[in-house]
Amino acid sequence: MRNKLKNFIFIFFCFSFLCKSANSNEAFIFNITEIEILENGNQINGYKGGTATSKDGSIITADKFFFNKLTNILEVTGNVKYLDSSNDIIITSDKAIYLKNEEKVYTTGNSKAVNANNTITASSLEYDKINNIFKAKKNAVAEDFEKETTIYADEITYLKNEEKVFTTGNSKAVNENNTITASSLEYDKINNIFKAKKNAVAEDFEKETTTYADEITYLKNE
């Protein structure tokens, strides 16, 4: 009887908390198995899995949640999934920090960003939601399925609105018939132009040619 009463009280508390969040000026609505509220309601911790939904419809799924209402910063760990439905983007990782005031997401561990035609993987990712910019660091890989191109580098920056990719460190671009390697690459996805800088090497497997130069510009459409 005591256990039933305890469960009822816990469920009632969670329901009351969700209703309060939904009807007030909260940054997130939490739907979590266990919730802990500390520091006069300014620190919200969640355990055993759940979701946090922001006003714009973005949903974060994770095992653990730590939200500071004063700073509007949400930290999540374990099986993290961030869904930005407005930009059609899904980000997964081991851990993530969401700076709500700046609309920026930082991930660490097994990080991956996916949309309709592109995938970016790396050890860590930065996502600037307002400017639609991705930065992938350490073992970064960017795949463009539409143009059948894969880019590898130490760091990759993807300007989604401009459809441009910039890389630094051990950079390599690969498609069906060509490979370009250099210290850094620039890829204009709209015009299909590659620029390789410093120790650039371009291989054309179809024509069986290799070009070496300090800088190489490859106009793929031509």
What are these regions (language model features)?
Residues 1-9:
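Bacterial N-terminal signal peptides that target proteins for export
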Residues 8-17:
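Bacterial N-terminal signal peptides
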Residues 21-222:
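N-terminal amphipathic/hydrophobic interface segments
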